[in-house]
Amino acid sequence: MKLTVKGLISLLLVPLFLAGCSKHEEQKAIQPAAHGQAAKKQATVVVPASVQGKWKAVKIAVTDKESNKETIYNVAIGSSFTIPATSLTINVDNFLPNFIMEGTTLTSQTNEPKNPAAQIRIREKGNEIFRGWLFSLYPTTHAFQHPRFSFTLVDFIPAS
């Protein structure tokens, strides 16, 4: 059997061509943060003096997706509340009537309820499963996805 130079080159290039065309994905190595590189900053919540003590509670609608039943609960700001017949507890940490974000600072521009938001934590069987915000005007923004319940900020109660 006599091979020509062209035949020999073809035989050598075919495996290279096939290997080059097959799907091959490289795993990128996770790079550690560079020395001196800043870590992602946590947001800081600042309740202005003009807002402190002006609001006493928020009203949170809890909808049971299985029964399609909605119940509204009043939860005092700075307190926690266990939803009856569940292992869920809601903590309301802060209320900002006119929520704004300035860099990493979350605050209220005024005491007027123009963009109401409640900072909450939800625990199930003692384990925190959500830490975030409920927005009255934008209920689906950053909404917590629980398999059975949904949570919505529906109202807020001023201090006397």
For each predicted feature, which ranges?
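Bacterial signal peptide processing site
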Residues: C21-E25
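Short acidic, Pro/Gly- and aromatic-enriched capping/linker segments at domain boundaries
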Residues: V58-P84
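Mature extracytoplasmic domains of secretory-pathway proteins
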Residues: S79-R121
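Sec-dependent bacterial lipoprotein signal peptides
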Residues: M1-A19
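Short polybasic amphipathic segments
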Residues: K56-T63, A117-I122
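A structural signal for short, hydrophobic beta-strand segments that form beta-sheets
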Residues: I77, I90-D93, F151-P158
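C-terminal partner/receptor-binding element of secreted or periplasmic proteins
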Residues: K114-P116, N127-S160
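Post-signal peptide N-terminal segment of mature Sec-exported envelope proteins
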Residues: A29-Q52
